[in-house]
A protein has these predicted regions:
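Juxtamembrane extracytoplasmic/periplasmic/luminal helical "stalk" adjacent to the first N-terminal
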Residues: 1-3, 51-54, 65-67, 101-111, ...
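Extracytoplasmic/periplasmic sensory segments of membrane signal-transduction proteins
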Residues: 1-80, 131-164, 171
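Generic short beta-strand
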Residues: 5, 106-109, 156, 263
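Conserved beta-strands of PAS-like sensory domains
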Residues: 17-19, 69-89, 97-140, 167-170, ...
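Solvent-exposed, extracytoplasmic
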Residues: 31, 35-36, 41-44, 90-97, ...
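PAS/PAS-like sensory domains
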Residues: 48-57, 83-87, 256-263
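A short beta-strand signature of PAS-family and PAS-like sensory folds
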Residues: 57-60, 65, 91-92, 263-266
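Extracellular/periplasmic juxtamembrane segments that couple receptor/chemosensory ectodomains to their
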Residues: 116, 190-318
Length: 319
């Protein structure tokens, strides 16, 4: 379940460690020594009281793809790419040879001795176990599946409470970090946002988005920024800036006060029933939002979803 179990002292120095990530004992007060240089928990955990738990975001290196959907020789040829599926993000049946998104969720709690804080216990949950909740689900089939197939439009995926994707059959849609810098890789944006970014002279899209309005006039009339796909293959889904996907705003509204809800959308030339349900986990920073850890969304082709009822209707009409 865990990629790492560590005890470190109040200065951040690891004392006892079992790890699949790095078996060297490190000084965790230095961000460069944390997982893919992306964790900044050391200052946050200083205020933890006895029994309290720090819970991180999903932390993992982004895996991109310059091909969306089934990875074929025809598509790579059209995009002037070599047919090397292993160099692009994993996508279930669409690209079973692709690079997997690997990540952790870190849990930290303080250790006290005679009323004095002396160190911390840290557990790094393997994100694979979170993905198994959604990758094994097909909303139009009764049994769990071994491998997801997003091409048919029937699948489940997961978002954090802010609307960033943390689990998807297409791993390249999961928001992640640059493993060399520890900086979050910006999500896929609409073409109009890309234009404003270029006009802003900001040093990076990541910096530009820090001050850009969230969920700005999301509409199907807006188009995706194809430069991100063709040039960088950076397609992480961050609902806050995915302005060509208005269902994002719908999911956020449905889950705003916790609970769940459904609506129908027209997406990729198919009518789909989409359902969003919050994840009631309220430990650490997740106690501050009614969405808890985030929410799961399930999308199903409307015709397939109602296929059993439609067949019954046809039989009745034949009588």
């Amino acid at each position: 379940i865990y990629k790492e179990v560590v005890y470190f002292d109040i200065k951040g120095q690891e004392k006892f460690k079992i790890s699949e990530i790095n078996d060297k004992k490190l000084d965790l007060s230095q961000k460069n020594n944390t997982y893919i240089k992306a964790e900044s928990y050391f200052e946050d955990i200083k205020s933890l009281k006895e029994g309290e738990i720090y819970v991180s975001d999903v932390i993992g290196a982004y895996v991109g793809s310059k091909i969306i959907g089934t990875f074929t020789k025809e598509k790579t040829k059209k995009s002037s790419l070599a047919f090397r599926p292993e160099l692009h993000g994993y996508a279930g049946k669409e690209n079973p040879l692709g690079k997997r998104f690997e990540a952790i969720v870190r849990f930290i709690t303080p250790v006290f001795s005679q009323g004095k804080k002396v160190g911390y216990i840290s557990l790094a949950l393997d994100h694979r176990h979170i993905m198994e909740y959604t990758d094994t689900v097909n909303p139009v089939k009764e049994h769990k599946q071994d491998i997801a197939d997003a091409s048919v439009g029937n699948y489940a995926f997961m978002w954090n409470f802010e609307g960033q994707n943390i689990s998807h059959p297409r791993d390249y849609f999961i928001v992640g970090y640059n493993e060399n810098t520890g900086e979050k890789v910006p999500g896929w944006v609409s073409a109009d946002v890309q234009k404003q970014y270029q006009e802003s002279k900001s040093k990076s899209l990541h910096e530009f988005l820090k001050t850009y309005p969230k969920f700005e006039e999301q509409s199907l009339t807006k188009k995706p920024n194809l430069k991100q796909l063709k040039q960088k293959g950076e397609l992480g889904l961050d609902c806050r800036y995915l302005n060509f996907a208005p269902q994002c705003q719908g999911w956020m509204q449905v889950t705003e006060n916790g609970g769940y809800g459904s609506f129908i959308i027209y997406w990729s030339k198919v009518w789909k029933l989409t359902t969003a349900a919050t994840i009631p986990y309220y430990t650490g920073k997740y106690k501050n939002t009614k969405r808890g850890f985030g929410f799961v969304t399930i999308g199903a082709n409307v015709d397939e979803f109602h296929s059993a009822a439609n067949k019954t209707k046809m039989k009745i009409e034949e009588v």
